[in-house]
Regions:
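A short N-terminal helical cap/helix-turn-helix that marks the beginning
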Residues: 22-48, 72-99
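Residue-level signal for alpha-helix termini/capping positions
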Residues: 87, 130, 134, 182, ...
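Adenylate-forming
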Residues: 24, 82-86, 118, 122, ...
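Short helix-terminating capping/connector loops at secondary-structure junctions
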Residues: 90-91, 134-138, 217-226
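Structural core segment of the AMP-binding/adenylate-forming
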Residues: 160-256, 279
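Short, contiguous pre-domain boundary segments
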Residues: 1-19
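Conserved AMP-binding/adenylate-forming core of the ANL superfamily
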Residues: 78, 92, 96-156, 173-178, ...
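Active-site diphosphate/adenylate-binding microenvironment
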Residues: 44-74
Length: 285
C-alpha cells in the first residue's frame, strides 16, 4: 500500500522533533547557544559560555523556582525583525504583503511594505510614544486594531523602546476590552475608528468610548489614545503620527521588553512574556 506523502512528511517532522528535543535535554547549553547565534546581540560572545544551570528549577512543588535565561545577554526584538534583515541587504524586500477584507469606507486596501518601510513606520510610532504619549520602558500599550499592517507596526514600536504590547482582538466587546485594559493597567490605547470584517462595518470608536467609561468606573483611566483612520470630530484621540524624529538615545534599541499573552480561567488574565523568549519560541517552532 502506498503511504500518502503527507503522512511521510508528518513522520519525518516527528522524528526530527524527537531528535532535537533529546539533544536539547542532553546538551541544553549547546542547544540554546546554537540558536542564539542566529540573532543579533549587543554582546554576541556571551553564547560561547552558555552553560546549564545545575540549580535550575521549573517546578514550584520542588522548591523555589530558579531560572536563568542567557544571563548577561542583550538584544532587541524589533532590531532582529527589521534592522538585522535590512543590514543583510533585504531592506527593499517585502516584509508584509497585505490585502484587506473590505477596507476603510469599502475601498479594498492592498499594500506591500518593505523592511525599510516597516521600520520607518514603526520608528514614527515609537517616537510618538516617547515624545507625545510619554511612554516609558515597561508601560503597557493596548493594541485594539483590526488585522492591518499598523498592528504589526505597533508591536514593533513597542519592542523598539521596551514597552509592553497587549494585543486585543478588534471584535471584542466594550466589556472585554475594558477588562483587558484594566487588567494590564494600560497607559496608551492604539485603535482605529472603523473596522470591516466579512463585509460588515464595525464602529470601533463606539466600542472604545463605552470601554473607557467602564475603565473609569473601575478606577483606571487611559492617558493617551492614538487612532488610525481617525474621525475629523474625534478630538479625544490623536491622529496616527506622520512625522518622524530621532528616537531618544535612552530608548533606541531598548534591550529586553515584554508582551502580554492571554490566559484563560474563569476570566481572562494577561501573562507577561519576555521578548527574549518570544524570538526563540518563533525560531524553534
Amino acid at each position: 500500500m502506498d503511504v500518502p506523502v503527507e503522512t511521510m512528511d508528518a513522520q519525518e517532522r516527528l522524528r526530527r522533533y524527537q531528535e532535537t528535543y533529546a539533544y536539547s535535554i542532553r546538551y541544553p547549553g549547546a542547544f540554546w547557544a546554537e540558536r542564539a547565534q542566529k540573532f543579533s546581540w549587543e554582546n554576541p560572545n556571551f553564547f560561547k559560555t552558555v552553560e546549564h544551570n545545575e540549580h535550575e528549577n521549573f517546578d514550584a512543588r520542588q522548591g523555589d523556582v530558579n531560572i536563568e535565561f542567557f544571563k548577561g545577554a542583550k538584544t532587541n526584538l524589533a532590531y532582529n525583525c527589521l534592522d538585522a534583515n535590512i543590514n543583510k541587504g533585504l531592506g527593499d524586500k517585502p516584509a508584509i504583503i497585505f490585502e484587506s477584507d473590505e477596507g476603510f469606507r469599502e475601498e479594498k486596501r492592498c499594500e506591500t511594505l518593505t523592511y525599510l518601510q516597516l521600520k520607518d513606520k514603526s520608528d514614527k510610532l515609537a517616537n510618538h510614544f516617547i515624545y507625545v504619549c510619554d511612554v516609558k520602558p515597561g508601560d503597557v500599550v493596548v493594541c485594539y486594531l483590526p488585522m492591518i499592517p499598523e498592528a504589526v507596526v505597533t508591536m514593533m514600536a513597542c519592542a523598539r523602546i521596551g514597552a509592553v504590547h497587549n494585543v486585543v482582538f478588534a471584535g471584542y466587546s466594550a466589556e472585554a476590552l475594558a477588562k483587558r485594559i484594566v487588567d494590564s493597567k494600560a497607559k496608551v490605547l492604539i485603535s482605529a475608528a472603523m473596522s470591516y470584517r466579512g463585509g460588515k462595518a464595525i464602529e470601533l470608536f463606539k466600542i472604545i468610548a463605552e470601554a473607557e467609561k467602564i475603565c473609569e468606573m473601575q478606577g483606571h483611566k487611559i492617558e493617551e489614545r492614538v487612532c488610525h483612520f481617525n474621525l475629523p470630530d474625534n478630538e479625544s484621540h490623536r491622529d496616527w503620527p506622520k512625522e518622524k524624529a530621532e528616537i531618544l538615545a535612552a530608548y533606541k534599541q531598548r534591550h529586553g521588553g515584554n508582551e502580554m499573552s492571554p490566559a484563560w480561567t474563569d476570566a481572562p488574565h494577561g501573562i507577561m512574556r519576555p521578548y527574549y523568549g518570544h524570538i526563540f519560541l518563533i525560531e524553534t517552532n
